[in-house]
Amino acid sequence: FEAAVAYAVAEQLGFDAAGVTWVRTTFDGAIAPGPKTFDFNLQQYSITEERQKVVDFSSGYYDVTQAVVTYAGSPIAEATTVAELKDAKLGAAVGTTSLKAIDEIVQPSQKAAVFNDNAAAVTALKNKQIDGLVVDLPTAFYLTAVEIENGVIVGQLPESASGAEQFGLLLAKDSPITECVTGAVDALREDGTLDELADEWLASAGAPVLT
């Protein structure tokens, strides 16, 4: 999904697919203050006021919810309410809005486990060191389909008091192209392209909202 959005934004800016160059960055490295090795970055970054102090964001390209992932037969596999997660050992990657969602929405009785990245959290889940992990919904579908044998999406967490999250393209602070990139994203939203890409690459079936 992110790659499709990147190519669509590039096209809006006058670049064809051959003109797009991909570079690897870590999640934390890309969001740290300082110069960047990219023009814009898509790693499912939620737009937050705290992050906007050190980087720029485009307007939002996807309205995102957080989801709880586990394995079949786990203590929370059949949960249908947030209350049923209160006593679970949940985990998330450091610095993510997923970790914030555990604390603010679930408010578990035991402190959330914090991992360097989603890969480490998945390993902990496979080893049954945690009952479940919280990630954004697109990642939840990927993990349960590809990474976690007998993986299960317990459900989506309800919206937090601070409102719905949005993913945005991340740019260097005060980047000269932030306005142009935002204009491209806005155009893709207005002409329906973003909705079409979400329908093509993402789905919400099988991920009910926990009450």
Task: Report residues per predicted region.
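Extended ligand-binding regions for polar small-molecule ligands
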Residues: A3-Q12, S74, T96, Q166-S204
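Ligand-binding clefts/hinges and TM-proximal coupling segments of bilobed small-molecule sensing domains
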Residues: T97-A113, V152-V154, G183-T211
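Acidic, polar ligand-binding/catalytic clefts
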Residues: Y7, A18-V82
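Hydrophobic residues within well-ordered alpha-helices
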Residues: V9, P33-P35, L85, L125-K126, ...
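A ligand-binding cleft/hinge motif common to bilobed small-molecule-binding domains
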Residues: G29, Y45-K53, D103-E104, D131-G163
